Amino acid sequence: MKKCLIVDDSRVIRKVARKILEELKFDVDEAEDGAAALEVCKRKMPDAILLDWNMPTMSGVEFLRALRREPSGGKPVVVYCTTENDLTVITEAMGAGANEYIMKPFERETVVAAFTEAGLV
């Protein structure tokens, strides 16, 4: 079973995303911010990460840059998920190592399409 880490400071978003990803047969972990996500990744590197942009403590892009610098960081597929519909944000996310980009609020089909496009489903 593939592992996915949901990183978002919104409990509601994590709950909705968990339901969708579990339907897709992912083993799901959650983190409220980038710092907590790094700790989860040190214990158990996921195959995929659904990552929010704006979070307290450590933003999504800060987390992603830190993860990609880790020698043992592996290369999980990262699907960026945010309310920001700005080319600068999208460019920064992709430049930091995101594989896919979806907008919040998202529909189930959007998440499924992003994970399918990334080769995870």
What are these language model-derived features?
Residues 15-23:
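Charged docking surfaces used in two-component/phosphorelay signaling
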Residues 25-32, 40:
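Short hydrophobic/Thr-rich beta-strand motif most characteristic of the beta2 strand and flanking loop
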Residues 33-36, 59-65:
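Acidic catalytic/metal-coordinating carboxylates
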Residues 44-50:
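Active-site beta3 strand of CheY-like receiver
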Residues 55:
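Receiver (REC) domain active-site loop signature in two-component systems and cognate sites
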Residues 62, 85-100, 113:
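Alpha4 helix (beta4-alpha4-beta5 surface) of REC/receiver domains from two-component response regulators
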Residues 106-115:
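C-terminal output helix
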